[in-house]
From Swiss-Prot:
One of its GO terms (biological process) is vesicle-mediated transport. InterPro entries: JIP3/JIP4, JIP_LZII, RH1, RH2, WD40/YVTN_repeat-like_dom_sf, WD40_repeat_dom_sf. Residues 58-177, 440-554 form a coiled coil. Residues 738-764 have a biased composition (Basic and acidic residues). Residues 458-514 are annotated as: Interaction with NTRK2. It comes from Homo sapiens (Human). Keywords: Cell projection, Coiled coil, Cytoplasm, Cytoplasmic vesicle, Disease variant, Golgi apparatus, Intellectual disability, Phosphoprotein. It is found in: Cytoplasm; Golgi apparatus; Cytoplasmic vesicle; Cell projection, Growth cone. Residues 260-269 have a biased composition (Low complexity). The modification Phosphothreonine is found at T265, T275, T286. This is C-Jun-amino-terminal kinase-interacting protein 3. Residues 1299-1308 have a biased composition (Acidic residues). The gene is MAPK8IP3. Pfam families: JIP_LZII (PF16471), RH1 (PF09744), WD40_2 (PF19056). The keyword Coiled coil applies.
C-alpha cells in the first residue's frame, strides 16, 4: 500500500507500508474458519449435529468480529503512522516558529535599544541647540549695545565737528582783521622805500625762494646738515640746535601754548593729553622720529588733514601769527633796517611775544642763534641769509606786502602756514593715536563680550554635567542591583555541581567584600550580553549532557534486560490452546538468553573538559563505546561464553535478514538480483560493489598508537625537472616510484616495472593525485606521521615525529598554479609596511597579522615544533638569509626530529642576529612556556630508517628538482596546541618548511586557488597566501572572525570556488578572494546542534549534525534544502535494535568517492550509499527519479529509511544538466567489516590492488564473483578504480563478532603470534576497499 502526500514545503512524501492488505487478512480468517469447520465435521461425524448446533453461530460471529477488528486495526495503524508524521512536521514547524519568535524578540530588543540610543542622541542635540541659541542671543545683545555706543559716539563727533567748524570760521575772521591792522601799521614805514625805488617789481623777490611755502621743505631738511649760501656754519642735528639755543620763552607762555595744543587735540576718552608742556612750545609734542617725516608723507598727510586744519583753535592761530611776524622781523641784517623792524615790533603788542628778552644784534655766532621750536629751524641762518642779501630784498618784501595783491598775502602767510602745518601734523598724529586707542578699546569690549559668552557656555555645560552626573549615579545604582541579580542567577545556574557552586559563592563573597561598591567595575551592555550568552551556553551543555545520559541509561537498560526475540501468540490462540489442550498446565517458560553487563559511554563525556578549555571536543584515545565490566561471581570462561552468545545473536540477526544479498563483505539489497533479467548486466552491476582488499593494524609493533586523521597526497600542478630521471640519483624514501612513473609519462620506461605501477601509469588522472596517504597517529607523548602507499597498504613507506601535541587535521595542498589568485590581492588597499615590526591592519572586519619581517622562506627548525618553542617567545633557529634567499649550505642540512634540542654550533651567533622577531600580536605566543622533551634516541644523525620500511637508502644531500620548496605540493598539519606545520609532499618529508603558532587549536584545513583557510577553535579563520616567489608566506595572514570565541569551526569543505564552514548549527559560505561571507543559513533548527561533516560533489553538499543520524542535502548554489536521509532505522534493522548499542547512531565520518556516499558512525559501522541522478521537478511535483542503478520508488517492500523527503527546487529546470547527489536508503549497503570505536576518517586515492595480495582480501571473490573481473575487461569498459581507506580503533566483523572468536584467531595466521588476540583487536586498524565505477 503506497500513499503520496504533499508536505508544507512543496515536496512529496512517499509512504509505503509493510502491512498485508485486506484480502490477506480475510484469507487468514477463512483459513481459521476452515479448520474450525473441519473440526465441527469431525464432531458431527463422531456425535451428532446437536452438539455443535448452538456453538456454530457463536463461532461464526466471533470470526466475523475478528475480521472486522483486524481490518480496523490495520486502518488505525495507518492513521497512527500518518499522525506520527504529522506530529513530526508539527514539531518541526513548532521549532521553526519558536526560533522565529526568538529572533523576533531579539530584533525587538535590538530595535528598542537602537531607539533608546537615538532618543538620547536627539535629546543631547536638543540641549546643544538650546545652548547655541542662548549663546547667539547673548551675542545679539552685545552687538546691540555696541551699536548704541557707536551711535552715541557718532552724535558726539558731529557736535564736535560743528563746534570746530564755527571756531575755524571765527579764527579766519580774526586772522583777516589782524592782517588788515598789520598792513595799516606798515603803510607809513614803506612809503619812502616806494618813492626811492619806483621801478621795483611788485612781486615777491626770487631770493626768498629759500623760504618755501608751508609744504614742509624746510622741516624735511632738519634731519640732515643744512648749508645756506655763503654760510660757513653747519647744523648738525636737532639736538645740537636745541642745546645751542639762547632763546627761551617764558614759562607761562609755554604753558599757554601747551594748553592750546592740548585744547586743539580732540579726546573722546576724557583723559588728559600726553603732550609735554613744561619746556617746549606747542610744536614740541611731535616726537623726533615723527618730525623727521619725509616730504612725500607730509604732503599726503597735509591733503588728508584738510578738514582737521579747519578745526584749529583761533587762539593758537593768533600766537602762530605773532611768531611768524616776529621771525620774519628777526631775519633782517643791517642795523638801520633792524631798528625799523624793532620799532614795528615795539609798536605792536601782539608781535612782542618775549618782551623781557632782546637779541644781541652783534651776535652772529651760531651759538647765539634762536631756535624756533615752533618751526624746528635755526633763525640765525635765516638772519644771515637776509643780511647778506642786502636792503633791497627787505624793500621788495615790504613793497610786495599788499593785502589785496596776489603775492602779498602769500609772503605774509608764510610763517603762519608753517605753524598751521605743524599743528595739522600734530593733530593727525593725535587722531591716529586716538584711532589706535579706539581699536584697542573695541577689541577689549569684544573680548569682554566673548569671555562673558564663554562664561555663560561654561555655566550651561556645568549644569548639564551636574545633571548627567545625577543620571549616571542613578544608572550605577540600577546596574548594581542588576549585577546582584545576575550573580544570583549565575550561582543558581551553576548549582548542578555543588563544589563549583560553593567555589563561585565563596569567590563572589570574597571579591565583593574586598572591593567597595563605589569602586567596583561597572558593567556595560556588551558585558551583560556576554554574561547572558555564557549562561545560555552552560544551559546548552547541560542539555547535551542530559541527552547523553538519557541515551546511556536507555542503552544500559537494553543491555541488562534483553527482550525475547520470539513471536508472541495472541490471546485467542492461548484461549483455544487451553480449551483444547490435554493438560491445563501452561508450557514451560523459555530460558532467556544470557546477558552481559555492557556500559555505553556517551560521546560527549569523553572530551568534555578539553572542549571546555580548548573549545573543541576531541575523541579520547582510550574511550570505547563498549566496556565489559567483570562480575565477581563469574569466571573468565563464563564471561567469554556470554560474549560469544551475545555476538551469536548479532550473527543470527544478520544471517536471517530476509531478502538481502551478501557479497564481498557487504549486505546488498535484493534489487541487485531483480532489476535486470539478463545475467551479464547483473554482473556489471555487481562489479561496482566495493571490494575489501586490506584490513590490518596500522603499526604492528606499537599497540598504543591511535589514529586521528589522514589525507591523500595531491600532486596536481607539479612537475620535476627533466634531468631528474637521468641524473643517476636514486629516489629518496620520501619519493614515490609510482609518482615518478606517472610524472615522467612522456619519457622512456622507468626501471620500476611492477604491474601495479604500470596500471597506475595508464590511468589518465593519476598524475593529479598520488596513491600515498599520510596518516596522523598519536601515543601518550608524541604525534607521528605514518606514510603508506594505498596500493601496498601493508608496507610503511616512512614515519617520523611531528610534535608533542595531538595533530587534529591534515590537508594536502597542491603546487603553485597559474590559476591561483594573485598574491598581491591579499592585501587589498591597505598600506602595510613590510619592514614595520608592528604591521597590522583591519580590512572590513578582517585583521591583518604580520611578523617582524616578510621573510620569503621562514623555515624554522623542527626543534621549535613541540608543545612550546624551545627559545623564548617562539623564536626558533632559522636558516641564514642572504639577499632575501636562504643560504644553500643551510638548506641542505639534515632534518632533525620534532622534539630534538638544537646543538649550538659555530654559526649560532650569525644566525642569532638574523632571527625574525616575535609576532605582532602577543596572543600568538605561549604565555607559559614549558621545556620541550629531550632528544630522542636515534634522531641525532638524521632520520633512522624504520624496520618496516623497504627503502633504507639515505636522503640525498640536495634537492635538484626544487621539491624542498613550499611552491611544490605540501602537506599542512594542524595541532591541538595551535601550531601549524608545513611539510613537503614530494621529498624530504621530515623537514618542516614552515611553522607558525596560532591563537587556538587548528581543527580543519582547506585550499582554494592559492589560499589556505585554517579553522580555529575560537571561531576564527586564518587565511594564508603565497608570496611573490610562489612559496607560502606564513608571516602575513588574515584573521576572519565568524562569531563568539566559545564556539569552534568544526569542519570546512571546498564547493567550487567557495568554502563552506560549519559553525554551531549554521553553515557560512565564504569567498576566499574577497574574504567575505556570501551566505549563512541554518543547517539545523536547534541552536545547540553543531555541524560536524561536509561532503561535496556536483551541485550538492551533504551535511551531518552532531548527535544526529540524519544526513541533509543542500544545493551548492541556491543553498536550498533538498533531501533528508536517516540512517538509524537502517542500522537498527541490519544489526538489531538492542544489540551492542547500535540503536544510538551518530555520524563521525563522511566522504563522497566512487559515485558513493560513505558514512562512518560512532559505533564503527561503515555504510555506502550509491548516488542517484538529478530529480526532475516541475512546480514542486515529483515527475521522475532516475537512479544510477535502481529507482527508490520501485515496487519493493518497505525498507528502513525508504521514506524520502524531496523538496522542490525551482531552479532545477534551468540547470537540468547538473548533477545533484541524491541517495536512497533502499540502495544502501552495509559493510560487515567495521571498527570497535568510531570511524575516524575516510580517505580516497586512486589505485588498483589485485584481489589476491598476500591473502589480504577479507572476503573471497567466490562470495561475489563480479568484482574479480580481469583487468583488461575493466579497462575495456573504461572503468575508474579508486581506493577508499577507513581508520578507527579496533576491528569487528559483525558476522562473527569483534574478532575475538576462534575463527578470527585461525584467520589471523602468523599475526596471532606477535601479540595476544585481545590486544590485536583493540589496535588501530585501517580497512581498504577498491571501487570500480564509471564516471558520469
Amino acid at each position: 500500500m503506497m500513499e503520496i502526500q504533499m508536505d508544507e514545503g512543496g515536496g512529496v512524501v512517499v509512504y509505503q507500508d509493510d502491512y498485508c492488505s485486506g484480502s490477506v487478512m480475510s484469507e487468514r480468517v477463512s483459513g481459521l474458519a476452515g479448520s474450525i469447520y473441519r473440526e465441527f465435521e469431525r464432531l458431527i461425524h463422531c456425535y451428532d449435529e446437536e452438539v455443535v448446533k448452538e456453538l456454530m453461530p457463536l463461532v461464526v460471529n466471533v470470526l466475523e468480529n475478528l475480521d472486522s477488528v483486524l481490518s480496523e486495526n490495520q486502518e488505525h495503524e495507518v492513521e497512527l503512522e500518518l499522525l506520527r508524521e504529522d506530529n513530526e512536521q508539527l514539531l518541526t514547524q513548532y521549532e521553526r516558529e519558536k526560533a522565529l519568535r526568538r529572533q523576533a524578540e531579539e530584533k525587538f530588543i535590538e530595535f528598542e535599544d537602537a531607539l533608546e540610543q537615538e532618543k538620547k542622541e536627539l535629546q543631547i542635540q536638543v540641549e546643544h541647540y538650546e545652548f547655541q541659541t542662548r549663546q547667539l542671543e547673548l551675542k545679539a545683545k552685545n552687538y546691540a549695545d555696541q551699536i548704541s555706543r557707536l551711535e552715541e559716539r557718532e552724535s558726539e563727533m558731529k557736535k564736535e565737528y560743528n563746534a570746530l567748524h564755527q571756531r575755524h570760521t571765527e579764527m579766519i575772521q580774526t586772522y583777516v582783521e589782524h592782517i588788515e591792522r598789520s598792513k595799516m601799521q606798515q603803510v607809513g614805514g614803506n612809503s619812502q622805500t616806494e618813492s626811492s625805488l619806483p621801478g621795483r617789481r611788485k612781486e615777491r623777490p626770487t631770493s626768498l625762494n629759500v623760504f618755501p611755502l608751508a609744504d614742509g621743505t624746510v622741516r624735511a631738511q632738519i634731519g640732515g646738515k643744512l648749508v645756506p649760501a655763503g654760510d660757513h656754519w653747519h647744523l648738525s642735528d636737532l639736538g645740537q640746535l636745541q642745546s645751542s639755543s639762547s632763546y627761551q620763552c617764558p614759562q607761562d607762555e609755554m604753558s599757554e601754548s601747551g594748553q592750546s595744543s592740548a585744547a586743539a587735540t580732540p579726546s573722546t576718552t576724557g583723559t588728559k593729553s600726553n603732550t609735554p608742556t613744561s619746556s617746549v612750545p606747542s610744536a614740541a609734542v611731535t616726537p623726533l622720529n615723527e618730525s623727521l617725516q619725509p616730504l612725500g608723507d607730509y604732503g599726503v598727510g597735509s591733503k588728508n588733514s584738510k578738514r582737521a586744519r579747519e578745526k584749529r583753535d583761533s587762539r593758537n592761530m593768533e600766537v602762530q601769527v605773532t611768531q611768524e611776524m616776529r621771525n620774519v622781523s628777526i631775519g633782517m641784517g643791517s642795523s638801520d633796517e633792524w631798528s625799523d623792524v624793532q620799532d614795528i615790533i615795539d609798536s605792536t603788542p601782539e608781535l612782542d611775544m618775549c618782551p623781557e628778552t632782546r637779541l644781541d644784534r652783534t651776535g652772529s655766532s651760531p651759538t647765539q642763534g634762536i631756535v624756533n621750536k615752533a618751526f624746528g629751524i635755526n633763525t640765525d641762518s635765516l638772519y644771515h641769509e637776509l643780511s647778506t642779501a642786502g636792503s633791497e630784498v627787505i624793500g621788495d618784501v615790504d613793497e610786495g606786502a599788499d593785502l589785496l595783491g596776489e603775492f602779498s598775502v602769500r609772503d605774509d602767510f608764510f610763517g603762519m602756514g608753517k605753524e598751521v602745518g605743524n599743528l595739522l601734523l600734530e593733530n593727525s598724529q593725535l587722531l591716529e593715536t586716538k584711532n589706535a586707542l579706539n581699536v584697542v578699546k573695541n577689541d577689549l569690549i569684544a573680548k569682554v563680550d566673548q569671555l562673558s559668552g564663554e562664561q555663560e557656555v561654561l555655566r550651561g555645560e556645568l549644569e548639564a554635567a551636574k545633571q548627567a552626573k545625577v543620571k549616571l549615579e542613578n544608572r550605577i545604582k540600577e546596574l548594581e542591583e542588576e549585577l546582584k541579580r545576575v550573580k544570583s542567577e549565575a550561582i543558581i545556574a551553576r548549582r548542578e555541581p555543588k563544589e563549583e557552586a560553593e567555589d563561585v559563592s565563596s569567590y563572589l563573597c570574597t571579591e565583593s567584600d574586598k572591593i567597595p561598591m563605589a569602586q567596583r567595575r561597572r558593567f556595560t551592555r556588551v558585558e551583560m550580553a556576554r554574561v547572558l550568552m555564557e549562561r545560555n551556553q552552560y544551559k546548552e551543555r547541560l542539555m547535551e549532557l542530559q541527552e547523553a545520559v538519557r541515551w546511556t541509561e536507555m542503552i544500559r537498560a537494553s543491555r541488562e534486560h534483553p527482550s525475547v526475540q520470539e513471536k508472541k501468540k495472541s490471546t485467542i490462540w492461548q484461549f483455544f490452546s487451553r480449551l483444547f489442550s490435554s493438560s491445563s498446565s501452561p508450557p514451560p517458560a523459555k530460558r532467556p538468553y544470557p546477558s552481559v553487563n555492557i556500559h555505553y559511554k556517551s560521546p560527549t563525556t569523553a572530551g568534555f573538559s578539553q572542549r571546555r578549555n580548548h573549545a573543541m571536543c576531541p575523541i579520547s584515545a582510550g574511550s570505547r563505546p563498549l566496556e565489559f565490566f567483570p562480575d565477581d561471581d563469574c569466571t573468565s570462561s563464563a564471561r567469554r561464553e556470554q560474549k560469544r552468545e551475545q555476538y551469536r545473536q548479532v550473527r543470527e540477526h544478520v544471517r536471517n535478514d530476509d531478502g538481502r544479498l551478501q557479497a564481498c563483505g557487504w549486505s546488498l539489497p535484493a534489487k541487485y538480483k531483480q532489476l535486470s533479467p539478463n545475467g551479464g548486466q547483473e554482473d556489471t552491476r555487481m562489479k561496482n560493489v566495493p571490494v575489501p582488499v586490506y584490513c590490518r593494524p596500522l603499526v604492528e609493533k606499537d599497540p598504543t598508537m591511535k589514529l586521528w586523521c589522514a589525507a591523500g597526497v595531491n600532486l596536481s600542478g607539479w612537475r620535476p625537472n627533466e634531468d631528474d630521471a637521468g641524473n643517476g640519483v636514486k629516489p629518496a624514501p620520501g619519493r614515490d616510484p609510482l609518482t615518478c612513473d606517472r610524472e615522467g609519462d612522456g619519457e622512456p620506461k622507468s626501471a620500476h616495472t611492477s604491474p601495479e605501477k604500470k596500471k597506475a601509469k595508464e590511468l589518465p588522472e593519476m598524475d593529479a593525485t598520488s596513491s600515498r596517504v599520510w596518516i596522523l597517529t598519536s601515543t601518550l607523548t608524541t604525534s607521528k606521521v605514518v606514510i603508506i602507499d594505498a596500493n601496498q597498504p601493508g608496507t610503511v613507506v616512512d614515519q617520523f615525529t611531528v610534535c608533542n601535541a595531538h595533530v587534529l587535521c591534515i590537508s594536502s595542498i597542491p603546487a603553485a598554479s597559474d590559476s591561483d589568485y594573485p598574491p598581491g590581492e591579499m592585501f587589498l588597499d591597505s598600506d602595510v609596511n613590510p619592514e614595520d615590526p608592528g604591521a597590522d591592519g583591519v580590512l572590513a572586519g578582517i585583521t591583518l597579522v604580520g611578523c617582524a619581517t616578510r621573510c620569503n622562506v621562514p623555515r624554522s627548525n623542527c626543534s621549535s615544533r613541540g608543545d612550546t618553542p624551545v627559545l623564548d617567545k617562539g623564536q626558533g633557529e632559522v636558516a641564514t638569509i642572504a639577499n632575501g634567499k636562504v643560504n644553500p649550505s643551510q638548506s641542505t642540512e639534515e632534518a632533525t626530529e620534532a622534539t630534538e634540542v638544537p646543538d649550538p654550533g659555530p654559526s649560532e651567533p650569525e644566525t642569532a642576529t638574523l632571527r625574525p622577531g616575535p609576532l605582532t600580536e602577543h596572543v600568538f605566543t605561549d604565555p607559559a612556556p614549558t621545556p620541550s622533551s629531550g632528544p630522542q634516541p636515534g634522531s641525532e644523525n638524521g632520520p633512522e630508517p624504520d624496520s618496516s620500511s623497504t627503502r633504507p637508502e639515505p636522503e640525498p644531500s640536495g634537492d635538484p628538482t626544487g621539491a624542498g620548496s613550499s611552491a611544490a605540493p605540501t602537506m599542512w598539519l594542524g595541532a591541538q596546541n595551535g601550531w601549524l606545520y608545513v611539510h613537503s609532499a614530494v621529498a624530504n618529508w621530515k623537514k618542516c618548511l614552515h611553522s607558525i603558532k596560532l591563537k587556538d587549536s587548528v581543527l580543519s584545513l582547506v585550499h582554494v586557488k592559492g589560499r589556505v583557510l585554517v579553522a580555529l577553535a575560537d571561531g576564527t579563520l586564518a587565511i594564508f597566501h603565497r608570496g611573490e616567489d610562489g612559496q607560502w608566506d606564513l608571516s602575513n595572514y588574515h584573521l576572519m572572525d565568524l562569531g563568539h570565541p566559545h564556539h569552534s569551526i568544526r569542519c570546512m569543505a571546498v564547493v567550487y570556488d567557495r568554502v563552506w564552514c560549519g559553525y554551531k548549527n549554521k553553515v557560512h559560505v565564504i569567498q576566499p578572494k574577497t574574504m567575505q561571507i556570501e551566505k549563512s543559513f541554518d543547517a539545523h533548527p536547534r541552536r545547540e546542534s553543531q555541524v560536524r561533516q561536509l561532503a561535496w560533489i556536483g551541485d550538492g553538499v551533504w551535511v551531518s549534525i552532531r548527535l544526529d543520524s540524519t544526513l541533509r542535502l543542500y544545493h551548492a548554489h541556491t543553498h536550498q534544502h533538498l533531501q533528508d536521509v536517516d540512517i538509524e532505522p537502517y542500522v537498527s534493522k541490519m544489526l538489531g535494535t538492542g544489540k551492542l548499542g547500535f540503536s544510538f547512531v551518530r555520524i563521525t565520518a563522511l566522504l563522497v568517492a566512487g559515485s558513493r556516499l560513505w558514512v562512518g558512525t560512532g559505533n564503527g559501522v561503515v555504510i555506502s550509499i550509491p548516488l542517484t541522478e538529478t530529480v526532475v521537478l516541475h512546480r514542486g511535483q515529483l515527475l521522475g527519479l532516475r537512479a544510477n542503478k535502481t529507482s527508490p520508488t520501485s515496487g519493493e517492500g518497505a525498507r528502513p529509511g525508504g521514506i524520502i523527503h524531496v523538496y522542490g527546487d525551482d531552479s532545477s529546470d534551468r540547470a537540468a544538466s547538473s548533477f545533484i547527489p541524491y541517495c536512497s536508503m533502499a540502495q544502501a549497503q552495509l559493510c560487515f567489516h567495521g571498527h570497535r570505536d568510531a570511524v575516524k576518517f575516510f580517505v580516497s586515492v586512486p589505485g588498483n590492488v589485485l584481489a589476491t595480495l598476500n591473502g589480504s582480501v577479507l572476503d573471497s571473490p567466490a562470495e561475489g564473483p563480479g568484482p574479480a573481473a580481469p583487468a583488461s575487461e575493466v579497462e575495456g569498459q573504461k572503468l575508474r578504480n579508486v581506493l577508499v581507506l577507513s581508520g578507527g580503533e579496533g576491528y569487528i566483523d559483525f558476522r562473527i563478532g569483534d574478532g575475538e572468536d576462534d575463527e578470527t584467531e585461525e584467520g589471523a595466521g602468523d599475526m596471532s603470534q606477535v601479540k595476544p588476540v585481545l590486544s590485536k583487536a583493540e589496535r588501530s586498524h585501517i580497512i581498504v576497499w577498491q571501487v570500480s565505477y564509471t564516471p558520469e
